[in-house]
Amino acid sequence: MSKQLPQDFVMGGATAAYQVEGATKEDGKGRVLWDDFLDKQGRFKPDPAADFYHRYDEDLALAEKYGHQVIRVSIAWSRIFPDGAGEVEPRGVAFYHKLFADCAAHHIEPFVTLHHFDTPERLHEAGDWLSQEMLDDFVAYAKFCFEEFSEVKYWITINEPTSMAVQQYTSGTFPPAESGRFDKTFQAEHNQMVAHARIVNLYKSMQLGGQIGIVHALQTVYPYSDSAVDHHAAELQDALENRLYLDGTLAGEYHQETLALVKEILDANHQPMFQSTPQEMKAIDEAAHQLDFVGVNNYFSKWLRAYHGKSETIHNGDGTKGSSVARLQGVGEEKLPDGIETTDWDWSIYPRGMYDILMRIHNDYPLVPVTYVTENGIGLKESLPENATPDTVIEDPKRIDYVKKYLSAMADAIHDGANVKGYFIWSLQDQFSWTNGYSKRYGLFFVDFPTQNRYIKQSAEWFKSVSETHIIPD
């Protein structure tokens, strides 16, 4: 049965500066935490990515043609302040003015992220989210952007803070690649929320008339079985990745039950509790009461079972199905129940998880007035057909099926009261992936990376139909 979306519902594609722009050494751009990390790994490079730095007009024209009303983009902090602070690079400032003007020319509203995984190198070396200098410089950079880019009406402070903190210090898949440091993970989580709060409060004090929010990666966590120990493992995983952030950014306080779960994880790893001050908590509370929206990035769900051994993480970075391992000391082990479909990268396909997280925000965090689904999509191994022409349309029925199921779950949540106002597919075009390079394709538009030619995927045509009719077909 087809489902109806509200008439004011907006749809578009999502991008991130480091994953699409390329041009990492052009026009005075400074280095970021990934540059040295990827050089040493030697597996893949962030250039040319999708060459959005030079081809943004081509991609925005495609977005307009295929029914997009909105787009997610991020500002590369190190294009504006190559060193993270100090001297401004005017060529970087000029680029983003051109980008936003082109969005307007194509009748597409940009939702602009200030930090999308790309801390400037100097600040990363100073401690990244564990450094007070980083937090202060981030607020100063945000203030500059608010004053400079007055044409932007929708701002996002941080993209997926949980992905940064957990992958930097728990799983070790993001630089500095430390693992098992739950103390650093939770301190980074708190510090991110302090920086976010300071920026929200600053923006509101400037009375610029736009809106500001935050984007969270929220994967619903379920117990592997009905046993009490598996239920508790799911609660611990949820506290690590979801609950502390939801409490801080959407309720303005850390609930005692959440802090007890955090302390249990830290105690099991013989690590100290994170530090906070009354002044920081006051800022967090103030920000939660004036946040305009929350973005939900949801791709998959997790199932947890009790586990009492040492932490072990094996990241599936090449699409070898079944190669992932995730066991965390003091938390639990990820284990999929039988019958749950997965992608080649071991991400579960479970639309119910989208419904459950949207309803959780609606029911448990009533302060936040509006929700957007700011990322959702499926990574696939795709290739250009032989003898492709500019008119070639690449078939991707798996993507259409995936997005249809998740949009349907989202529509059910809207029907049941969740105030979801828009959906951004990850991703607009094929892009560079932080830990998978160029093998994992998410785009509505296929990018032939050697030539940078764009080709339409069938999903782009399907997406246009949904966007224009507001009807999700059977």
Curated annotation (Swiss-Prot):
Keywords: Glycosidase, Hydrolase. The active site is at E160, E375. Pathway: Carbohydrate metabolism; lactose degradation; D-galactose 6-phosphate and beta-D-glucose from lactose 6-phosphate: step 1/1. It comes from the Bacteria. D-galactose 6-phosphate binds at Q19, H116, N159, E160, N297, S433, W434, K440, Y442. GO terms for molecular function: 6-phospho-beta-galactosidase activity; beta-glucosidase activity. It catalyses: a 6-phospho-beta-D-galactoside + H2O = D-galactose 6-phosphate + an alcohol. Its EC number is 3.2.1.85. GO terms for cellular component: cytosol. SUPFAM superfamilies: (Trans)glycosidases. GO terms for biological process: lactose catabolic process via tagatose-6-phosphate. Belongs to the glycosyl hydrolase 1 family. This is 6-phospho-beta-galactosidase. The lineage of its organism: Bacteria, Bacillati, Bacillota, Bacilli, Lactobacillales. The gene is lacG.
